[in-house]
Curated annotation (Swiss-Prot):
The lineage of its organism: Eukaryota, Metazoa, Chordata, Craniata, Vertebrata. It is a single-pass type I membrane protein. GO terms for molecular function: peptide antigen binding; signaling receptor binding. Coiled coil: none annotated. The modification Phosphoserine is found at residues 343, 345, 349-350, 352, 356, 359. This is Class I histocompatibility antigen, Gogo-A*0201 alpha chain. It comes from Gorilla gorilla gorilla (Western lowland gorilla). Keywords: Disulfide bond, Glycoprotein, Immunity, Membrane, MHC I, Phosphoprotein, Signal, Transmembrane, Transmembrane helix.
């Protein structure tokens, strides 16, 4: 059986992303993992990726030839071999725990051994513009549905159903929340600070969106105006339509912010307008890189060059990455006031070979 169709993975991951949000000026480190059982084809496939803000920096795929945690950002490549040995060891331990958990959960739900099943996990921490801890989180899903989640107090759990209640009782007896809280408030924050400092030229940059508007007649009476924002970073952006100065959010078709494949992002928002009334509509673009919002209006005489090939290529790449690497199109909100600049102290050098503990959060269900 194939690991999973791109559309299925996209839906599962976007559903998980909707559960999280960051504050203005904050930074985040998040790990995403997926285990998929393959009856009759050997071990489950396990994929894990790590993100700092909107940038993927590490990746592991149990089907890859290297069988190692691999760098995905230039600034993480400077870590010593001991770091990569440690990260590989932890992520492999995580995959083995998930292998056991897949069997356990199949029993909880009285499922046969013939079907393929999926475990997903997201965990991480946020820091403010001063580098101090804001919050931590862990969320687990089974077969695309919520299973169990760490509450905001970092001391208790919310179980989604009766099967998850079994896991909740086990984890409470093992004091797993206390162990996880210590990691999220301590080591997770230290490594996030280190990564922000080492990768500040990339992680704390801003790339202004390249904007334009397109027009497509759908009938003799109506046309679609589409407002494009391309090649921007970070991912948080707002596109809004107005008619004669009045908000048109209810009538706007808006897509999720999507990675372009080159470290930047793209997004569009569209409205259907009566033919001949295009001039009454304006698109407003807000992004951290802009000193003030941009306002776009359709000009009938303009003939914009629409980079359709580039856009499609970016979306195809996005689908391929989702299918092969199980990443998330990270779109946590951050506003412009506090994000620029800032210096983050690194984790103590004595810990440099340990890495962020991606095995701690893998506990048997």
């Amino acid at each position: 059986m194939a690991v999973m169709a791109p559309r299925t993975l996209l839906l599962l991951l976007l559903g998980a992303l909707a559960l999280t949000q960051t504050w203005a000026g904050s930074h985040s480190m998040r790990y995403f993992s997926t285990s998929v059982s393959r009856p009759g084809r050997g071990e489950p496939r396990f994929i894990a990726v790590g993100y700092v803000d909107d940038t993927q920096f590490v990746r592991f795929d149990s089907d890859a030839a290297s069988q190692r945690m691999e760098p995905r950002a230039p600034w993480i490549e400077q870590e010593e071999p001991e770091y990569w040995d440690g990260e590989t060891r932890k992520v492999k331990a995580h995959s083995q725990t998930d292998r056991v958990n897949l069997g356990t959960l199949r029993g909880y739900y009285n499922q046969s051994e013939a079907g393929s099943h999926t475990i997903q996990k997201m965990y991480g921490c946020d820091v403010g513009s001063d580098g101090r801890f804001l919050r931590g989180y862990q969320q687990d899903a089974y077969d695309g549905k919520d299973y169990i989640a760490l509450n905001e107090d970092l001391r208790s759990w919310t179980a989604a159903d009766m099967a998850a209640e079994i896991t909740k009782r086990k984890w409470e007896a093992a004091h797993f929340a206390e162990q996880l809280r210590a990691y999220l408030e301590g080591e997770c924050v230290e490594w996030l600070r280190r990564y922000l400092e080492n990768g500040k030229e990339t992680l704390q940059r801003t790339d202004a969106p390249k904007t334009h508007m397109t027009h497509h007649a759908v009938s003799d009476h109506e046309a679609i105006l589409r407002c494009w924002a391309l090649s921007f970073y970070p991912a948080e952006i707002t596109l809004t339509w107005q008619r004669d100065g009045e908000d048109q959010t209810q009538d706007t078709e808006l897509v999720e912010t999507r990675p372009a494949g080159d470290g930047t992002f793209q997004k569009w928002a569209a409205v259907v307008v009566p033919s001949g009334q295009e001039q009454r509509y304006t698109c407003h673009v807000q992004h951290e890189s802009l000193p003030k919002p941009l306002t776009l209006r359709w000009e009938p005489s303009s003939q914009p060059t629409i980079p359709i090939v580039g856009i499609i290529a970016g979306l195809v790449l996005f689908g391929a990455v989702i299918a092969g690497a199980v990443i998330a199109a990270v779109r946590w909100r951050r506003k412009s006031s506090d994000r620029k600049g800032g210096s983050y102290s690194q984790a103590a050098s004595s810990d440099s070979a340990q890495g962020s503990d991606v095995s701690l959060t893998a506990c048997k269900v």
